Amino acid sequence: ACGEAAGVQGAEHSAGVAAQAGQVLLVNNAGLVSPIGPPGGQGAAAVMQAVALNVAAPLALADAWVAATAGVPDRRIVHISSGAARNAYAGWSVYCATKAALDMHARAVQLDAVAGLRIESLAPGVVDTGMQAHIRATDASQFPLVGRFQGLHRDGALQSPSDVARRLLDHVLGAAFGAEAVRDLRSI
């Protein structure tokens, strides 16, 4: 909760700097895959922590940031989404639901048609991150698809974070950004 408040205050504090810019970008990339496992064993505190980090913080930050950058002609928000937002996976009910919330937020914000604001919820694909290591270490009884993720790692099929970052920035700073509310970086 403290980090969320700091993020919102930081967005509000940046108003002076943003007013001098012609283009500003907000990337909501925080994500927590835990709790993993079926309901009944997830724990209320873990569920609430995931919802706070994966949904409440990005939405509150986006709201504060849009207000703080009102005078900037080109504002762009990208929510880093996941295939889990669009496909249900056993053991990931909380993660799927929270990522789907970001997709729906982007769709609804596009309908708001705020002047100078573009938004997308963008799934990057499977990237070689600490989250992936955590997923691969999960017991199959909690996440039946763990073998698929272990295989992607074993076969060298994970994308590097730097490659994904370059492709993501190329797209986010490009003219086509915001044409669709929900996209997959691999299809761009």
Give the location of each predicted region.
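Hydrophobic structural elements of the Rossmann-like NAD(P)H-binding subdomain
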Residues: 27, 78, 119-122, 132
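Active-site helix of classical SDR
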Residues: 62, 98
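Residue(s) in the substrate-gating loop at a strand-loop-helix junction
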Residues: 82
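C-terminal helical subdomain
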Residues: 121-124, 129, 137-188
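Active-site-adjacent segment of SDR/Rossmann-fold oxidoreductases
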Residues: 87, 108-117
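Conserved mid-core segment of classical short-chain dehydrogenase/reductases
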Residues: 17, 22, 31-48, 91
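Rossmann-fold cofactor-recognition segment
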Residues: 1-5
